[in-house]
Amino acid sequence: DLQGIGSLFHVANDIERIGDHAENIADMAVRRKELGVSFSADAQKELADMLTMVNVMIEKSIRFMLRSEGDEFMDELYELEARVDKKEKELQQHHIDRLTKQECTPEAGMLFSDVISGLERVADHALNISTYILHKDNADVATGAKV
């Protein structure tokens, strides 16, 4: 049905956007290396922690998309996305604190901020994918459509 096709179009768009953000983050890593910029040990750990959270979200979203998980799984995805949002705000504050204490360069700070913002957007798109699948499936149930 048209609603299901529309949902799948949105899923494809969100997958493409995840790829765009991944490419942007990779470009930032190259730029960091070219500029000779390094992150503090704390910043590196924070990035690794946030990356792990986002990777878990992507994996769970894929499992939901493949329908390896039931609809109740969405609560877990919403909770994870809220934790990623909170983590981004927390890391932005840590970044500002390091800049204020001159523990990092403005270049490192800018790249750090851009990377964590990109990761947060990836988490948003991962949640969108599951949300569109849920709505598509619920529309199919309501209309009796076959997928």
Predicted regions and their residues:
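Cytosolic, long alpha-helical scaffolding segments
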Residues: D1-V147
